Amino acid sequence: MSLNIETTQGLERRVAITVPTEIVSKAVREEFKRAAKNVRVDGFRKGHVPAHIIEQRFGASIRQDVLNDLLPRHFFNAVIAEKINIAGRPTFAIETFEEGKDLVFTATFEVYPEVKLQGLENIKVEKPTVEITEADIDKMIDVLRKQQATWAESQDVVKADDRVTIDFVGSVDGEEFEGGKATDFVLFMGQGRMIPGFEEGIVGHKAGEQFDIDVTFPAEYHAENLKGKAAKFAITLKKIENMVLPELTDEFVAKFGPNTKSVADLRAEIRKNMERELKNALVSRVKQQVINGLIEQNPIDVPVSAVEEEINVLRNQAAQRFGGNAQQTAQLPRELFEAEATRRVQVGLLFSEVIKSNELKADEERAKAMIADIASAYEQPAEVVEYYSKNEELMNNIRNVVLEEQAVDAVLAKAQVTEKVSSFDEIMNPQA
């Protein structure tokens, strides 16, 4: 077998491969022998069909089977011998496949780029340091109390955290518009569900009042005919309800688990959960900065085939998340996922090189600690640890996560790292 490799464009390669006629002829003979033992033809016993009948009826399909075997086998033998790191599947083109002649074909495929890391010392990472305060815990308790809140009808004016029941009719230039009318609409004030100015126009009014609100639809509003338009809403305020928060008693805190018997227990449990969430958020924030720095310092081309595979993964994930079927998934435009898919392939290649160049292997003790941390969120942590330890697929997933963390640490060791004091809210609610 001889071959010739050429670069067509970017990461695309074309290999011309010649398979000697002796190998081809032998493969064809062996396939005919196998067929002769197994084919069934009316009028002949199995294994006794004449060769010319087999040739007439099955010759073309037998040769196609031989071709289907020879092409990938000799292609992969060639790329292994040449140590070519292929991406995706090759496309074959037959140049010669005739009796008594060499098999000549080409394979077009992509290769993964050669990655040589550089500029790690130029990567800048801001590492937040956060202390969870008693005030942070108080805020979390307030959230829990609001989740358990009841509502009491009020005759006072509307305040920012009330619940109101209203009728409204919206109009633009005196004409009502589709979707601008509702009856007995329940609105939780202060949540920003309505367009700017709507909630603010209700604050200060009393139940039973009728009044108008003048607002302007945002320029980016989803309805094309309303973008940037001035509108008037006629409001009938039917009912106002004040939020009534439950008292912080032992009875209240008992709702949050069998081991939570007092306010002190609840605060301790909240702190533990906040610490776990904070730790994960900090790891994620630092990792994203490392990823951004790696990509910025090491711009690389990625194989189209690898990106397409990742697009399919993202499509399927989107379908699972939103309940779509396979047909609907296939119709989702690739442009929705292309940027993220490209980034994922880049990150995978760069992290692989970090792991390779630093000769990293997953730290088993670190993996055990990660499982213990995951298990701590469950009521029976020992059972969770045992479940992980007996499931090799889950263990490998954990090892891969640990290996990525070790790769991040390896980059941080060379990067410019600065610490910044931050609050819990700044890390957990960066958009707030």
Swiss-Prot record:
EC numbers: 5.2.1.8
SUPFAM superfamilies: FKBP-like (SSF54534), Triger factor/SurA peptide-binding domain-like (SSF109998), Trigger factor ribosome-binding domain (SSF102735)
Keyword hit for Chaperone: yes
Swiss-Prot/TrEMBL catalytic activity: [protein]-peptidylproline (omega=180) = [protein]-peptidylproline (omega=0)
Pfam families with a match to the protein in the record: FKBP_C, Trigger_C, Trigger_N
Keyword ATP-binding among UniProt keywords: no
Superkingdom of source: Bacteria
Cellular location(s): Cytoplasm
Residue ranges occupied by any PPIase FKBP-type domain in the UniProt entry: 161-246
UniProt keyword list: Cell cycle, Cell division, Chaperone, Cytoplasm, Isomerase, Rotamase
GO cellular component, one term: cytoplasm
GO biological process: 'de novo' cotranslational protein folding; cell division; chaperone-mediated protein folding; protein transport; protein unfolding
GO molecular function: peptidyl-prolyl cis-trans isomerase activity; protein folding chaperone; ribosome binding
Family from the record: Belongs to the FKBP-type PPIase family. Tig subfamily.
Function noted in UniProt: Involved in protein export. Acts as a chaperone by maintaining the newly synthesized protein in an open conformation. Functions as a peptidyl-prolyl cis-trans isomerase.
Domain notes: Consists of 3 domains; the N-terminus binds the ribosome, the middle domain has PPIase activity, while the C-terminus has intrinsic chaperone activity on its own.
PANTHER family linked: TRIGGER FACTOR CHAPERONE AND PEPTIDYL-PROLYL CIS/TRANS ISOMERASE (PTHR30560), TRIGGER FACTOR-LIKE PROTEIN TIG, CHLOROPLASTIC (PTHR30560:SF3)
Name of the molecule in the record: Trigger factor
Organism: Haemophilus influenzae (strain ATCC 51907 / DSM 11121 / KW20 / Rd)
Lineage start: Bacteria, Pseudomonadati, Pseudomonadota, Gammaproteobacteria, Pasteurellales
Name of encoding gene: tig
